[in-house]
Amino acid sequence: MGQKVHPNGIRLGIVKPWNSTWFANTKEFADNLDSDFKVRQFLTKELAKASVSRIVIERPAKSIRVTIHTARPGIVIGKKGEDVEKLRKVVADIAGVPAQINIAEVRKPELDAKLVADSITSQLERRVMFRRAMKRAVQNAMRLGAKGIKVEVSGRLGGAEIARTEWYREGRVPLHTLRADIDYNTSEAHTTYGVIGVKVWIFKGEILGGMAAVEQPEPAAQPKKQQRKGRK
């Protein structure tokens, strides 16, 4: 049988950034890795209803900086920033160093593989028909500008006795093209019949110029808006 390499792993350093960006010597590496895992585990559990896409961890000068990418920043921040302060204290205790938490808003959750997968799993847990949930996710992504999307669900679909896999695809999803910006993620729906696995691949277009183009995409767009205002 043909095997597939992880779409995110193969693109690291080419068009995908790492979720943990720090350097450590041999003695500290294991401790840093362990605290990274515990911080992510805590935040994922604590912010289960906040539509968290990814958690990026940096370690500048004996401190830890955590950036939470979420579609619902208001839920994470809380009233007058109280919730973020509580999270910061717990993260500092887990990591054992001063902590800073930044919030980054995900503008288009329909084009984020993790949020799409979580949306499908929540619908499956509410007993929505799996085909309807899949088609709705595909239509929303294509409507908002995705070049292609593939959604796969596997398990006891519809309560069937025998588990099976079904998938739905629209547009292009070129997994072998390394410069293709493909967002991939998974999620699990815990239903009365058992666990249903959900996988989502979203193709957003090709990135030319490698990591240099990925790390600074936004600043170039700002001067154009100012020029347009001047013309009016």
From Swiss-Prot:
InterPro entries documented for this protein: KH_dom, KH_dom-like_a/b, KH_dom_type_2, KH_sf_prok-type, Ribosomal_S3_C_sf, Ribosomal_uS3_bac-typ, Ribosomal_uS3_C, Ribosomal_uS3_CS
Family annotation (CDD domains): KH-II_30S_S3 (cd02412)
An example Gene Ontology biological process: translation
Keywords: Ribonucleoprotein, Ribosomal protein, RNA-binding, rRNA-binding
Keyword Aminoacyl-tRNA synthetase: no
Pfam families membership: KH_2 (PF07650), Ribosomal_S3_C (PF00189)
Domain (KH type-2) ranges: 39-107
One Gene Ontology molecular-function label: structural constituent of ribosome
Entry annotated with the keyword Kinase: no
Gene Ontology cellular-component terms listed: cytosolic small ribosomal subunit
Domain of life: Bacteria
Protein family according to the UniProt entry: Belongs to the universal ribosomal protein uS3 family.
Summary of subunit composition and partner proteins: Part of the 30S ribosomal subunit. Forms a tight complex with proteins S10 and S14.
Function: Binds the lower part of the 30S subunit head. Binds mRNA in the 70S ribosome, positioning it for translation.
Name this protein carries in UniProt: Small ribosomal subunit protein uS3
